[in-house]
Amino acid sequence: MTSSIRVPAALQEKFDTIALATDAFCDQHLNGDYKQLIRLALAALCRKRPSPLLKGQNNSWAAGAVHALGMVNFLFDDSQTPHCKATDIWAHFCLASSTGQTHSKKIRDALDMGPMDPQWSLPSHMDANPLIWMLEVNGLIVDIRQMPLEVQDIAYAKGLIPYVPGRKTGN
């Protein structure tokens, strides 16, 4: 997962305004993991040159960010916790669905997001996301969790996995 909240000074006010709106939505409907991940996405968008956030309304970008991360993490599946409907997002930010979906698509394209994207997955979804753990070792695709601890250590040192599964507490 991306981990930097660095924001260029010229976009700090824009970031703060949008993040305040997304934080309020997360506090009401989602959780702290979503709040943090959305802030990371907004910061990444601020660092793009030119930043797409320079065009459009703040509430459109806020709704788009919530929706984009929701798409990656299956927010709209009622078997997930938390979950909500896209219409709840549009209503909260007072937007038409077409506007929110357009901004969501712009964010997903700009940050190269897709379903179960390891970079944009919620921490609570890491263990269950096979895309995070499938790596090529000696020409074969393997689940790194099934490999020896030394191989897991190497994968972690290279930044290929978020943590060493064999060293995670509770294993």
What is the predicted function of each stretch?
Residues 1-59, 70-171:
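Basic, alpha-helical nucleic-acid-binding regions used in initiation and control of genome expression
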